[in-house]
């Protein structure tokens, strides 16, 4: 038996889950927020208890020390030596990493170099990896890449219709993201349907603050909505999703607050989407409250959101030449029945029909009617478990 920590580190946060492996039992989980800011918050959940501390945590190394000390302090482990592996979620692996890998100095350097593809994510992941390697140098660290699952896309799918020199010289192409989530829910969908994954055509919709849709053919990603960066695709919580690229120079010319392309991209990443259009929030619960109040901006934001998701799902029916099931996952995908209802309502031509009661009352599993030609599934994603499994598989290979 061994204990494995799955880590999802952001620029100012560190989310974690401790597993007993190979039993896949969750022993504890938590998050450290506001790293590098005043009044950082460390939350630990274990044995039905919740412990919260407000501290000043200056960097990721300090955050990791606090996490490990908390595990001992709360009696979750007796010593650091009980931990036999650490797995790290890394958003961008580019073309370098087609599967999960054991971390070494070269791998860490390459992850930092790939930050250009995920500037909001890779630097935080690298900081988390470095912190664990400094504090637990003898423990195997494994990187699990969001992009790895999408390396099965064909060249005509991942290349953009621009001169090929930009791919050859600068590796500009579609990489995708959320691959670990899409892989996991596809595997779970096959179990739920009682059919081999290798026989299924699935559309998986990861709808959280970030949104990505993937076309899965016989267990492999053949297309996905996120692109060169996670900014592409349908509308998201704070991200615009796809826009006409000519808007970028136009806004620089017109708006004195936007001085260069970086300013515009920052606006598209952090101040757009549901939040930017509604002026209320990036949280679908707040948007739905606005719908109840007939707030016109909330209504507009919601309608754009539904429209963009329907269009993306529809195009993947064409890519796959039909589908056996549509899978909803992640925060909104799992917990926003109105959103699911309105998305499916616009796709009824494809033969989808959902059971209203199962949809509304938080049912996990098949929410479609018996007559539905395409099954509609709600599956809770578990990226942390996928990470822990890869650590278990790779920890003796370094």
From Swiss-Prot:
> GO molecular function of the protein, one example?
magnesium ion binding
Q: What residue ranges carry the coiled-coil annotation? A: none
Identify the main location: cytoplasm
Q: Which domain of life is it from?
A: Bacteria
Q: In which pathway does it act?
A: Metabolic intermediate biosynthesis; acetyl-CoA biosynthesis; acetyl-CoA from acetate: step 1/2
InterPro entries in the cross-refs: Ac/propionate_kinase, Aliphatic_acid_kin_short-chain, Aliphatic_acid_kinase_CS, ATPase_NBD
Transmembrane domains' residue ranges: none
Keywords of this entry: ATP-binding, Cytoplasm, Kinase, Magnesium, Metal-binding, Nucleotide-binding, Transferase
One GO-annotated biological process of the protein: acetyl-CoA biosynthetic process
Show the Pfam families listed in the entry.
Acetate_kinase (PF00871)
Q: What is its EC number?
A: 2.7.2.1
Listed GO cellular component terms?
Answer: cytoplasm
* Marked site positions, Transition state stabilizer: 178, 239
Which free-text remark accompanies the cofactor?
Mg(2+). Can also accept Mn(2+).
Reactions catalysed, as given in the entry: acetate + ATP = acetyl phosphate + ADP
Which HAMAP family does the UniProt record give?
Answer: Acetate_kinase
Identify its protein family: Belongs to the acetokinase family.
Against PANTHER family, the record matches this protein to: ACETATE KINASE, ACETATE KINASE-RELATED
Name of the molecule in the record: Acetate kinase
Which species is the source of this protein? Answer: Streptococcus pyogenes serotype M49 (strain NZ131)
């Amino acid at each position: 038996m061994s204990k494995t920590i799955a880590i999802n580190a952001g620029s100012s946060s560190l989310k974690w889950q401790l597993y007993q492996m190979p039993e896949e039992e969750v022993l504890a989980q938590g998050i450290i927020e506001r790293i590098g800011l005043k009044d950082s918050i460390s939350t630990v959940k274990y044995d039905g208890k919740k412990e919260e501390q407000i501290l000043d945590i200056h960097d990721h190394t300090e955050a990791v020390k606090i996490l490990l000390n908390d595990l001992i302090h709360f009696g979750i482990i007796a010593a650091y030596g009980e931990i036999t592996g650490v797995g790290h979620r890394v958003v961008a692996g580019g073309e370098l990493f087609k599967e999960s890998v054991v971390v070494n100095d070269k791998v860490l350097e390459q992850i930092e170099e790939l930050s250009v593809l995920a500037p909001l994510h890779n630097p935080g992941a690298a900081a988390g990896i470095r912190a664990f390697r400094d504090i637990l140098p003898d423990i195997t660290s494994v990187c699990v890449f969001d992009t790895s699952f999408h390396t099965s896309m064909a060249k005509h799918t991942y290349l953009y219709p621009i001169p090929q020199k930009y791919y050859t010289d600068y590796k500009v192409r579609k990489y995708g993201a959320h691959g670990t989530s899409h892989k996991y829910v596809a595997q779970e969908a096959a179990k739920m349907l009682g059919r081999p994954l290798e026989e299924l055509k699935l559309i998986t919709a990861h709808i959280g603050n970030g949104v990505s849709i993937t076309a899965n053919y016989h267990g492999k990603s053949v297309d996905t909505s996120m692109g060169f960066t996670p900014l592409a695709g349908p509308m998201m919580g704070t991200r615009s999703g796809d826009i006409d690229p000519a808007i970028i120079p136009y806004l620089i010319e017109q708006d004195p607050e936007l001085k260069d392309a970086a300013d515009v991209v920052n606006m598209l990443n952090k101040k757009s989407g549901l939040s930017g259009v509604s002026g209320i929030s990036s949280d679908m619960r707040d948007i739905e409250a606005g719908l109840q109040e007939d707030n016109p901006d909330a209504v507009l934001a919601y309608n754009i959101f539904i429209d963009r998701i329907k269009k993306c799902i529809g195009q993947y029916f064409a890519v796959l030449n039909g589908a056996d099931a549509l899978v909803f996952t992640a925060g909104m995908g799992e917990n926003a029945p109105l959103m699911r209802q309105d998305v499916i309502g616009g796709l009824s031509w494809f033969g989808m029909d959902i059971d209203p009661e199962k949809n509304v009352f938080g049912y996990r599993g098949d929410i479609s009617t018996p007559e539905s030609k395409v099954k509609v599934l709600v599956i809770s994603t578990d990226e942390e478990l996928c990470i822990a499994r890869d650590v278990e598989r790779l920890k003796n290979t370094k």
